A protein has these predicted regions:
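Short, well-formed alpha-helical segments that are part of the catalytic scaffolds
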Residues: 8-26
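Cell-envelope/extracellular polymer assembly enzymes that use nucleotide-activated donors
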Residues: 3-5, 174
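Short beta-strand-to-loop acidic/aromatic patch adjacent to the donor-nucleotide binding site
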Residues: 78-89
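Acceptor/aglycone-binding surface of glycosyltransferases and processive sugar-polymer synthases
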Residues: 57-75, 92-169, 194-217, 221, ...
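A conserved acidic beta->alpha catalytic loop
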Residues: 35-44, 88
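A short, conserved alpha-helix in the catalytic core of glycosyltransferases
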Residues: 158-162, 168-185
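Short hydrophobic beta-strand elements that form part
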Residues: 5-9, 32, 55
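Acidic helix N-cap motif at the loop->helix transition within catalytic regions
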Residues: 15-19, 40-49
Length: 226
């Protein structure tokens, strides 16, 4: 039986964070929200829903929020850490798919890959994800179809072996690279991507794809320094 702490980085997500926390809490031992300098009621909504809330006084970026959260959750008695977004792009109802794969598969690193219809998202975002995922797959030697997905379940002991430095969304790629290099057996499950009113990704497709490519190249040609 695995025990799970959920880590949710949030920036100005008062509209959906409570719903995400409540949906997540049904499947995990503890839910931790990192309020990354929000100027709205994100922290209050998360607390009302039952989450432990850690707060940045100003916006430092998703990577910084994830690293703050990891410092906290890796000190808790949890065998795995679940990562998901606060904006409802990741359906908490899909969490059991990741848990089941962790319990009955290898269980090191389970990546929730979203179902994408080409016409269901902006072209720039779609193509940036495809290109970034193909490049990353080639350089790490493991097939990845959705490298930008932050929906993932990872063994705590493995996370303690790596040092993450990313401040922005590139931390998703950095995590994949460093954990695979540390020996993680990567497993993938297909998860439903929610469509909701007012959906707007904070990812900048061209900038973040460039960073993905640079990280992959650094891993390939300078493995001791990346």
């Amino acid at each position: 039986m695995i025990t799970v702490c959920a880590l949710i980085a949030a920036f100005n997500e008062e509209r959906y964070v409570g719903q995400v926390v409540r949906g997540t809490a049904a499947h995990v031992s503890r839910t931790v929200v990192i309020d990354d300098g929000s100027t709205d009621s994100t922290a209050a909504r998360a607390r009302e829903a039952g989450a432990t809330v850690l707060t940045h006084e100003r916006n430092l970026g998703k990577g910084s929020a994830v690293r703050t959260g990891l410092t906290y959750v890796l000190a808790q008695p949890c065998s795995h850490v679940l990562f998901l977004d606060a904006d409802l792009q990741h359906d908490p109802g899909e969490i059991p798919k990741l848990l089941d794969r962790a319990e009955h598969g290898v269980g090191d690193f389970v990546l929730g890959e979203r179902e994408f219809a080409r016409d269901a998202m902006p072209a720039a975002r779609f193509h940036s994800n495809v290109i970034g995922s193909r490049i990353l797959s080639r350089f790490i030697g493991a097939e990845v179809a959705d490298s930008q997905s932050g929906f993932r379940l990872i063994r705590s002991a493995l996370l303690r072996k790596v040092s993450l430095t990313g401040r922005g969304y590139e931390i998703e790629t950095e995590m994949l690279i460093k954990l695979v290099r540390a020996g993680a057996a990567l497993e993938r499950v297909t998860v439903r991507r929610l469509q909701y009113e007012g959906a707007r990704s904070k990812i900048r497709p061209f900038r973040d794809t460039f960073r993905t490519c640079m990280l992959a190249l650094a891993y390939r040609y300078f493995p001791g320094e990346s």
